[in-house]
Protein backbone atom coordinates (compact mmCIF):
# COMPACT_ATOMS: atom_id res chain seq x y z
CA UNK A 1 0.00 0.00 0.00
CA UNK A 2 2.84 2.38 0.87
CA UNK A 3 3.69 4.72 -2.02
CA UNK A 4 0.76 3.72 -4.24
CA UNK A 5 -1.36 6.71 -3.26
CA UNK A 6 1.52 9.13 -3.82
CA UNK A 7 2.28 7.61 -7.21
CA UNK A 8 -1.34 7.81 -8.30
CA UNK A 9 -1.65 11.40 -7.13
CA UNK A 10 1.54 12.39 -8.96
CA UNK A 11 0.28 10.72 -12.12
CA UNK A 12 -3.07 12.50 -11.89
CA UNK A 13 -1.42 15.89 -11.33
CA UNK A 14 0.92 15.40 -14.27
CA UNK A 15 -1.98 14.37 -16.48
CA UNK A 16 -3.85 17.52 -15.50
CA UNK A 17 -0.81 19.66 -16.28
CA UNK A 18 -0.71 18.13 -19.73
CA UNK A 19 -4.40 18.85 -20.29
CA UNK A 20 -4.00 22.42 -19.06
CA UNK A 21 -1.10 22.95 -21.39
CA UNK A 22 -3.20 21.72 -24.31
CA UNK A 23 -6.55 23.31 -23.52
CA UNK A 24 -6.29 25.69 -20.57
CA UNK A 25 -7.13 29.36 -20.82
CA UNK A 26 -7.25 30.83 -17.28
CA UNK A 27 -4.33 32.28 -15.34
CA UNK A 28 -5.09 30.88 -11.91
CA UNK A 29 -5.12 27.12 -12.31
CA UNK A 30 -5.84 25.03 -9.22
CA UNK A 31 -6.15 21.31 -8.60
CA UNK A 32 -8.87 20.09 -6.25
CA UNK A 33 -9.22 16.84 -4.31
CA UNK A 34 -11.68 15.30 -1.85
CA UNK A 35 -11.19 13.21 1.30
CA UNK A 36 -13.40 12.30 4.24
CA UNK A 37 -12.15 13.56 7.59
CA UNK A 38 -11.95 9.95 8.81
CA UNK A 39 -9.55 9.01 6.00
CA UNK A 40 -6.32 9.90 7.76
CA UNK A 41 -3.97 8.46 5.15
CA UNK A 42 -5.60 10.34 2.27
CA UNK A 43 -5.66 13.56 4.30
CA UNK A 44 -1.98 13.23 5.21
CA UNK A 45 -1.13 12.52 1.56
CA UNK A 46 -2.87 15.65 0.33
CA UNK A 47 -1.41 17.91 3.02
CA UNK A 48 2.08 16.57 2.32
CA UNK A 49 1.54 17.40 -1.36
CA UNK A 50 0.76 21.05 -0.44
CA UNK A 51 -3.02 20.85 -0.76
CA UNK A 52 -4.94 23.08 1.62
CA UNK A 53 -8.40 22.64 3.04
CA UNK A 54 -10.88 25.13 1.56
CA UNK A 55 -14.30 23.94 2.74
CA UNK A 56 -16.21 20.87 3.83
CA UNK A 57 -19.67 19.34 3.92
CA UNK A 58 -21.06 17.40 6.87
CA UNK A 59 -23.54 14.55 6.43
CA UNK A 60 -26.22 14.36 9.12
CA UNK A 61 -28.66 11.51 9.73
CA UNK A 62 -32.00 11.32 11.51
CA UNK A 63 -32.38 7.67 12.42
CA UNK A 64 -36.13 7.35 13.07
CA UNK A 65 -38.78 9.56 11.51
CA UNK A 66 -41.33 8.08 13.91
CA UNK A 67 -39.61 9.93 16.75
CA UNK A 68 -39.97 13.51 15.53
CA UNK A 69 -40.40 16.12 18.27
CA UNK A 70 -43.40 18.36 18.64
CA UNK A 71 -43.15 21.80 17.09
CA UNK A 72 -42.46 23.46 20.43
CA UNK A 73 -43.16 26.97 19.13
CA UNK A 74 -45.77 28.78 17.10
CA UNK A 75 -45.22 30.65 13.87
CA UNK A 76 -45.08 34.44 14.03
CA UNK A 77 -48.36 36.25 13.42
CA UNK A 78 -49.25 36.33 9.74
CA UNK A 79 -47.02 33.40 8.74
CA UNK A 80 -48.62 30.28 7.29
CA UNK A 81 -47.18 27.09 5.80
CA UNK A 82 -48.36 24.76 3.06
CA UNK A 83 -47.37 22.58 0.09
CA UNK A 84 -45.59 23.97 -2.97
CA UNK A 85 -47.48 23.70 -6.25
CA UNK A 86 -46.28 24.40 -9.77
CA UNK A 87 -47.52 27.99 -9.56
CA UNK A 88 -45.12 28.52 -6.64
CA UNK A 89 -42.00 27.17 -8.37
CA UNK A 90 -40.43 30.49 -9.31
CA UNK A 91 -40.96 31.95 -5.84
CA UNK A 92 -39.49 28.81 -4.24
CA UNK A 93 -36.47 28.89 -6.54
CA UNK A 94 -35.90 32.58 -5.86
CA UNK A 95 -36.15 32.00 -2.11
CA UNK A 96 -33.34 29.44 -2.26
CA UNK A 97 -31.14 31.44 -4.64
CA UNK A 98 -31.46 34.62 -2.58
CA UNK A 99 -30.58 32.78 0.63
CA UNK A 100 -27.17 31.89 -0.87
CA UNK A 101 -26.45 35.35 -2.25
CA UNK A 102 -23.82 36.15 0.40
CA UNK A 103 -22.10 32.75 0.50
CA UNK A 104 -19.15 31.19 -1.31
CA UNK A 105 -18.72 27.81 -3.02
CA UNK A 106 -22.22 27.65 -4.47
CA UNK A 107 -22.98 26.51 -7.98
CA UNK A 108 -25.17 28.43 -10.38
CA UNK A 109 -28.72 27.03 -10.22
CA UNK A 110 -31.01 28.22 -12.99
CA UNK A 111 -34.77 28.21 -12.80
CA UNK A 112 -34.85 25.66 -15.61
CA UNK A 113 -32.60 23.35 -13.57
CA UNK A 114 -35.04 23.75 -10.69
CA UNK A 115 -38.03 22.87 -12.87
CA UNK A 116 -36.29 19.92 -14.54
CA UNK A 117 -35.59 18.22 -11.20
CA UNK A 118 -38.73 19.30 -9.33
CA UNK A 119 -40.23 16.61 -7.07
CA UNK A 120 -42.71 18.55 -4.91
CA UNK A 121 -44.44 15.73 -3.01
CA UNK A 122 -42.51 16.62 0.17
CA UNK A 123 -41.92 20.31 -0.45
CA UNK A 124 -43.20 22.86 2.06
CA UNK A 125 -43.17 26.66 2.07
CA UNK A 126 -43.95 29.51 4.44
CA UNK A 127 -45.72 32.68 3.37
CA UNK A 128 -46.19 36.10 4.90
CA UNK A 129 -49.47 37.01 3.24
CA UNK A 130 -48.61 36.53 -0.47
CA UNK A 131 -44.81 36.63 -0.08
CA UNK A 132 -42.90 33.36 0.24
CA UNK A 133 -40.40 33.66 3.08
CA UNK A 134 -39.00 30.13 3.41
CA UNK A 135 -38.91 26.65 1.90
CA UNK A 136 -38.07 23.09 2.90
CA UNK A 137 -37.36 20.99 -0.20
CA UNK A 138 -37.38 17.31 0.78
CA UNK A 139 -37.48 14.19 -1.38
CA UNK A 140 -37.34 10.40 -1.26
CA UNK A 141 -34.16 8.79 -2.57
CA UNK A 142 -34.88 7.26 -5.95
CA UNK A 143 -33.23 3.92 -5.23
CA UNK A 144 -33.75 3.88 -1.43
CA UNK A 145 -37.42 4.55 -0.85
CA UNK A 146 -37.12 4.43 2.93
CA UNK A 147 -34.51 7.22 2.99
CA UNK A 148 -35.55 10.85 2.77
CA UNK A 149 -33.34 13.80 1.85
CA UNK A 150 -33.57 17.37 3.08
CA UNK A 151 -32.18 19.01 -0.04
CA UNK A 152 -32.77 22.64 0.90
CA UNK A 153 -33.92 24.53 3.96
CA UNK A 154 -33.93 28.25 3.25
CA UNK A 155 -35.48 31.22 5.02
CA UNK A 156 -35.22 34.79 3.81
CA UNK A 157 -32.71 36.90 5.71
CA UNK A 158 -35.25 39.26 7.27
CA UNK A 159 -37.36 36.33 8.52
CA UNK A 160 -34.66 34.29 10.29
CA UNK A 161 -34.54 33.55 14.05
CA UNK A 162 -38.34 33.49 14.22
CA UNK A 163 -38.83 29.71 14.31
CA UNK A 164 -39.90 29.47 10.67
CA UNK A 165 -37.03 27.17 9.68
CA UNK A 166 -37.82 24.66 12.44
CA UNK A 167 -41.52 24.53 11.52
CA UNK A 168 -40.70 24.05 7.84
CA UNK A 169 -38.12 21.37 8.60
CA UNK A 170 -40.53 19.38 10.74
CA UNK A 171 -43.28 19.77 8.13
CA UNK A 172 -40.93 18.44 5.47
CA UNK A 173 -39.82 15.52 7.64
CA UNK A 174 -43.42 14.57 8.36
CA UNK A 175 -44.12 14.66 4.63
CA UNK A 176 -41.21 12.27 4.08
CA UNK A 177 -42.64 9.96 6.72
CA UNK A 178 -46.06 10.02 5.05
CA UNK A 179 -44.38 9.05 1.77
CA UNK A 180 -42.81 5.97 3.37
CA UNK A 181 -39.39 7.19 4.53
CA UNK A 182 -38.13 5.87 7.85
CA UNK A 183 -34.87 7.85 8.06
CA UNK A 184 -33.61 11.16 6.69
CA UNK A 185 -30.26 12.64 5.72
CA UNK A 186 -28.91 16.04 4.78
CA UNK A 187 -25.64 17.77 3.93
CA UNK A 188 -24.61 21.18 5.22
CA UNK A 189 -21.47 23.28 4.99
CA UNK A 190 -19.28 23.60 8.07
CA UNK A 191 -18.69 27.32 7.44
CA UNK A 192 -22.33 28.10 8.14
CA UNK A 193 -22.87 31.42 9.96
CA UNK A 194 -26.51 30.67 10.80
CA UNK A 195 -25.91 27.88 13.37
CA UNK A 196 -27.90 25.41 11.31
CA UNK A 197 -26.38 22.52 13.30
CA UNK A 198 -28.32 23.59 16.37
CA UNK A 199 -31.58 23.45 14.42
CA UNK A 200 -30.86 20.08 12.82
CA UNK A 201 -29.73 18.50 16.07
CA UNK A 202 -32.79 19.85 17.89
CA UNK A 203 -35.04 17.65 15.73
CA UNK A 204 -32.84 14.54 16.00
CA UNK A 205 -30.15 14.73 13.30
CA UNK A 206 -26.69 13.46 14.22
CA UNK A 207 -23.37 13.90 12.45
CA UNK A 208 -22.17 10.98 10.30
CA UNK A 209 -19.33 12.01 7.97
CA UNK A 210 -17.41 15.12 6.96
CA UNK A 211 -16.31 15.50 3.33
CA UNK A 212 -13.39 17.90 2.95
CA UNK A 213 -12.39 19.75 -0.22
CA UNK A 214 -8.70 20.51 -0.78
CA UNK A 215 -7.02 22.69 -3.40
CA UNK A 216 -3.57 23.75 -4.47
CA UNK A 217 -2.33 25.96 -7.33
CA UNK A 218 -0.47 24.58 -10.30
CA UNK A 219 3.07 25.80 -10.89
CA UNK A 220 1.73 27.57 -13.98
CA UNK A 221 -1.80 28.51 -14.86
CA UNK A 222 -4.60 28.01 -17.30
CA UNK A 223 -7.80 27.00 -15.61
CA UNK A 224 -9.64 25.41 -12.72
CA UNK A 225 -9.21 21.64 -12.70
CA UNK A 226 -10.11 18.84 -10.36
CA UNK A 227 -8.65 15.52 -9.21
CA UNK A 228 -11.75 13.78 -7.90
CA UNK A 229 -12.04 11.12 -5.20
CA UNK A 230 -8.42 10.88 -4.11
CA UNK A 231 -9.72 9.04 -1.03
CA UNK A 232 -10.61 6.08 -3.23
CA UNK A 233 -6.97 5.42 -4.14
Predicted regions and their residues:
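A conserved beta-turn-beta hairpin within the catalytic core of GNAT-like acetyltransferases
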Residues: 1, 27, 141-150, 160, ...
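Acyl-donor-binding surface of acyltransferase catalytic domains
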Residues: 1-76, 210-216
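Conserved acetyl-CoA-binding loop-helix of GNAT-fold acetyltransferases
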Residues: 2-18, 155, 161-178, 183, ...
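Conserved hydrophobic beta-strand within the GNAT/NAT acetyltransferase core sheet
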Residues: 31-33, 150, 184-188
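Conserved active-site tyrosine of GNAT-family acetyltransferases
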Residues: 42, 46, 200, 205
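A short beta-loop-alpha structural element at the N-terminal edge
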Residues: 80-92, 233
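A conserved beta-strand-loop-helix scaffold within acyl/acetyltransferase catalytic domains
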Residues: 101-155
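Short glycine/proline-centered loop/turn elements that form peptide/ligand docking sites
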Residues: 169, 192-196, 213-218
Amino acid sequence: RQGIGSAMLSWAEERIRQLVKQHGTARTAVIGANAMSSEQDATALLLAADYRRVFSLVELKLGDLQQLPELGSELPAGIRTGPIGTSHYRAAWRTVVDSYADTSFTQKWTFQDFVDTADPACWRAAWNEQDMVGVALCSIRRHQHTVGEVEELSVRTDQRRLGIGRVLLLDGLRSLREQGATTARLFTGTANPHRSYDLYESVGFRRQNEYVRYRKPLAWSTGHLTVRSVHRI
